[in-house]
């Protein structure tokens, strides 16, 4: 593989400085002077490649909602260089056969690096040996016997925090915040547990108190209640007061995820009571977090922790920092004004459309190759860092 030099302002060792980075698939050397193969324009900043722990790329029999090419292209467009895919596709991904099918689909078509989660499984001994990142525990799983065995796995366990009772009866039950908070006690005492898409500051603080890592989503911060199917999501959007409190948690959570959950337009146009929940804005997260930096709400140090360093630490993989021997994945950004819209996803309408942002993605580099440049995505081949195809 060709070894390249890139020169520009970069964030490394908690400093922004002018550097030259030498890389192929991994970072080889960092120094101050070089003859660059890629010279970046003024106003750009090289960050460690951004990571999204929670997406639903769909594919398989749900490819009409989103497929691997469209979903991972949207990721690269939005500065995400590594994504984690949830198992609730069709077929459900929790057996050797379905995991193999999902991994094969990503291996052939993914335009960013990727990893997958298994659902709770009765075949834990075999599934645990597969190149997966861990397990997703849904509310209905908290009543299953096999979940107790999954919780003992050394791999990462990601919990959707709602008690099983929240699934029964009227949707208004889900608006009870204690149904979310109570779910954390089901997994109390277990190791390597991550709480995803917390919707209120109580959940965040309890998660930290119990020794878990935790994330939030941009839409739980920004979207104003559930008014129609476009804003319907699980766990539900909270009221304005709760969302303002949740914004305070931006300095307490470990990472921010998209929970990209695409559905076809005809599905989201169904009546609110029966339409599927989910907001699909995979490319929003990184520009939004960097917009918070531009506005002085968080520091650049905190931003890099949220989108790169902390998710890599949670996964225990060589990403998230610009240092020798880490994978050569970079998110290169510019601070400039624009209004959000999706570009490559099959979802063309989100409740975040038109949101004013102050940061955009100039380029992504994935496995040492240019994955996107000024909005145009290229067909690079992503890898599974948990797999054999490193």
From Swiss-Prot:
Gene Ontology biological process terms in this record: 'de novo' UMP biosynthetic process; purine nucleobase catabolic process
UniProt-annotated binding residues for Zn(2+) 2: 136, 160, 197
List of residues binding Zn(2+) 1: 54, 56, 136, 259
UniProt entry tagged with the keyword Oxidoreductase: no
Coiled-coil positions: none
GO molecular function ontology, one term from the record: allantoinase activity
Keywords: Hydrolase, Metal-binding, Pyrimidine biosynthesis, Zinc
Pathway(s) it belongs to: Pyrimidine metabolism; UMP biosynthesis via de novo pathway; (S)-dihydroorotate from bicarbonate: step 3/3
Pfam families in alphabetical order: Amidohydro_1 (PF01979)
Residues modified to N6-carboxylysine: 136
GO cellular component annotations of the record: cytoplasm
Active-site residues, record numbering mapped to chain: 259
Cofactor: Zn(2+)
Catalysed transformations (reactions): (S)-dihydroorotate + H2O = N-carbamoyl-L-aspartate + H(+)
Cytoplasm among keywords: no
Protein function: Catalyzes the reversible cyclization of carbamoyl aspartate to dihydroorotate.
Entry's family note: Belongs to the metallo-dependent hydrolases superfamily. DHOase family. Class I DHOase subfamily.
PANTHER family: ALLANTOINASE
Name of the molecule in the record: Dihydroorotase
Gene name in the database record: pyrC
């Amino acid at each position: 593989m060709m070894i390249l030099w890139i020169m520009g302002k970069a964030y490394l060792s908690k400093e922004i400085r002018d550097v030259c980075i030498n890389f192929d698939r991994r970072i080889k050397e960092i120094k101050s002077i070089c003859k660059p193969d890629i010279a970046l324009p003024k106003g750009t900043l090289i960050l460690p490649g951004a990571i999204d722990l929670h997406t639903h790329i769909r594919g398989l029999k749900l490819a009409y909602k989103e497929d691997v090419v469209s979903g991972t292209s949207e990721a690269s467009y939005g500065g995400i260089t590594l994504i984690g895919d949830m198992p609730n596709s069709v077929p459900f991904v929790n057996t050797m056969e379905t995991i193999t099918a999902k991994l094969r689909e990503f291996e052939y078509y993914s335009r960013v690096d990727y990893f997958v989660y298994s659902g709770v499984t009765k075949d834990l001994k075999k599934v645990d040996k597969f190149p997966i990142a861990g397990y997703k525990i849904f509310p209905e799983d908290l009543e299953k016997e096999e979940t107790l065995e999954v919780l003992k796995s050394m791999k990462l366990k990601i919990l959707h925090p709602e008690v099983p009772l929240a699934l029964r009866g009227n949707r208004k039950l889900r608006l009870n915040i204690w149904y979310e908070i109570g779910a954390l006690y089901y997994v109390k005492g277990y190791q390597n547990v991550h709480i995803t898409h917390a919707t209120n500051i109580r959940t965040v603080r309890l998660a930290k108190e119990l020794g878990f890592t935790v994330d939030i989503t941009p839409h739980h911060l920004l979207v104003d209640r559930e008014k129609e199917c476009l804003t319907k999501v699980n766990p539900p959007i909270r009221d304005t007061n709760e969302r303002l409190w949740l914004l305070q948690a931006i300095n307490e959570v470990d990472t921010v995820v998209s929970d990209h959950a695409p559905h076809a337009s005809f599905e989201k146009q169904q009546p609110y009571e029966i339409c599927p929940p989910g907001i699909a804005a995979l490319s929003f997260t990184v520009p939004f977090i960097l917009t918070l930096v531009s506005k002085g709400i968080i520091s650049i140090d905190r931003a890099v922790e949220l989108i790169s360093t902390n998710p890599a630490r949670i996964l225990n993989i060589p990403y998230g920092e610009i240092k020798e021997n880490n994978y050569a994945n970079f998110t290169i950004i510019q601070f400039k004004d624009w209004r959000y819209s999706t570009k490559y996803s099959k979802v063309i309408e989100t409740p975040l459309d038109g949101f004013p942002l102050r940061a955009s993605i100039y380029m992504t580099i994935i496995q040492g190759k240019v994955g996107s440049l000024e909005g145009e995505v290229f067909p690079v081949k992503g890898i599974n860092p948990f797999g054999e195809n490193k």
